[in-house]
């Protein structure tokens, strides 16, 4: 899911899902099994708890002036690249990345950049079919 956070600050939270879990399964659970593979699926929603984080398309983001089509494409591409690096590192340790969240913002020149750390609390990871809580994940990953 691509979550757009405080629009005034022009920060975005991005969720890239490799497995059908979380908000994706809440929306589409009657159409797909929980944990089913998703090919680096990136979904865009506005981060708005009162409205249930409504879905928003790339075209809507452009029309609303939230970002350009090029900025959206850059965020999506960067998200998928970073996610694959994290997934590969976890796989080396016998773990499976289900989904991960990043925060992106804009540099003064308008380019998109990652503005948050890659942390265990921002991802869902499983080992041998069991969810790994963030504290345990940190211990396993850095062991």
Model-derived regions: residue spans:
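Conserved metal-phosphate-binding beta-hairpin within the catalytic cores
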Residues: 16, 97-117
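Detector for glycine-centered tight turns/loop "hinges" at secondary-structure junctions
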Residues: 52, 94, 109-110, 129
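C-terminal helix-cap and adjacent tail motif
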Residues: 118-143
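Phosphate-binding core of ATP-grasp and ATP-grasp-like enzymes
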Residues: 35, 40-52, 83-96, 120-123
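A long amphipathic alpha-helix within ATP-dependent nucleotide-binding catalytic cores
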Residues: 66-98
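Single conserved hydrophobic/aromatic residue that forms the stacking wall/gate
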Residues: 1-10, 14
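Short, His- and charge-rich active-site/binding loops that engage polyanionic ligands
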Residues: 11, 15-58
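Short histidine-centered catalytic/ligand-binding loop motif
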Residues: 46-78
């Amino acid at each position: 899911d691509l979550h757009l956070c405080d629009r005034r600050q022009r920060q975005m939270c991005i969720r890239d899902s490799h497995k059908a879990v979380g908000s994706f399964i809440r929306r589409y659970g009657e159409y797909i099994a929980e944990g089913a593979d998703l090919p680096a699926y990136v979904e865009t929603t506005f981060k708005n708890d009162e409205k249930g984080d409504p879905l928003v398309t790339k075209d809507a983001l452009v029309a609303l002036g939230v970002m350009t089509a090029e900025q959206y494409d850059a965020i999506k591409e960067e998200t998928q690249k970073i996610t694959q690096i994290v997934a590969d590192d976890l796989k080396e340790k016998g773990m499976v990345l289900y989904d991960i969240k990043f925060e992106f913002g804009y540099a003064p020149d308008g380019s998109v950049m990652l503005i948050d750390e890659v942390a265990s609390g921002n991802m869902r990871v499983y080992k041998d079919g069991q969810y790994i809580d963030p504290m345990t994940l940190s211990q396993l990953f850095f062991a």
